[in-house]
Amino acid sequence: MSENTTHFGFRTVPEHEKANMVRAVFDSVAGKYDVMNDLMSIGIHRLWKRIAVDLAHVRSGEKVLDLAGGTGDLTALFRKRVGARGFVVLSDINAEMLRRGRDRIIDDGLAESVAYAQIDAEKLPFPHDSFDCISIGFGLRNVTHKDKALNSMYRALKPGGRLIVLEFSEVHNELLRKAYDLYSFKVLPFLGKLVANDAESYRYLAESIRMHPNQEKLKAMMEKAGFERCEYFDLMQGIVAVHRGYKF
């Protein structure tokens, strides 16, 4: 793959086109995003997110940046942990997803001490040492230059700050992997067509999971960006993994 191309699912595309293509996917699925998440995971995604927040060890009064925050699930959980004395930034590169997240936070009565930002994870517009914790949930696989994004996150974290990456990963059990592939490439697009009238976007999401670095590769990328004490926690045999790293 040349330096001017990247992957969009299983397709090879010009680097400069990927962000707009990803944006179009989430423009398409935004209206049914929460419904599809519940349906695709039988609601288990909510448990995964709670585990990720538990591993972040955020405390009252801390500042958190939730990247690719979408409809606000992680932001809501973080806001409850840091309280009104803390501060959470709900961010997403997609305006429609961010709008839905903002509406949800307001409806849940959590708007105090929450801000909103439409930003690119590769170019965070915050000063050095701004946040106690940065999270990115089910979003890093959609980033074109993951190394740039990790470097940007490292810069924006305070010394002692934590990075939490919640993402689909590599399944360890061979039998489960075969069943998961069948579900991902047959059932998932069917559900996307049935519920969201968009099979192609969910086919891309399945492909993007397979193209994402596995647990060890992502851990190495975090270490290369400067993070220390990097580790990961497999959930459901590696269908999902939570990576954690510290800036010291």
From Swiss-Prot:
Example of a GO MF term: 2-methoxy-6-polyprenyl-1,4-benzoquinol methyltransferase activity
Keyword Transcription regulation set for record: no
Residues that hold S-adenosyl-L-methionine according to the record: 71, 92, 120-121
Keyword check for Magnesium: no
Catalytic reaction equation(s): a 2-demethylmenaquinol + S-adenosyl-L-methionine = a menaquinol + S-adenosyl-L-homocysteine + H(+); a 2-methoxy-6-(all-trans-polyprenyl)benzene-1,4-diol + S-adenosyl-L-methionine = a 5-methoxy-2-methyl-3-(all-trans-polyprenyl)benzene-1,4-diol + S-adenosyl-L-homocysteine + H(+)
Top-rank lineage group of the source organism: Bacteria
Protein name (record): Ubiquinone/menaquinone biosynthesis C-methyltransferase UbiE
Organism listed in the record: Methylococcus capsulatus (strain ATCC 33009 / NCIMB 11132 / Bath)
Gene from which this protein is expressed: ubiE
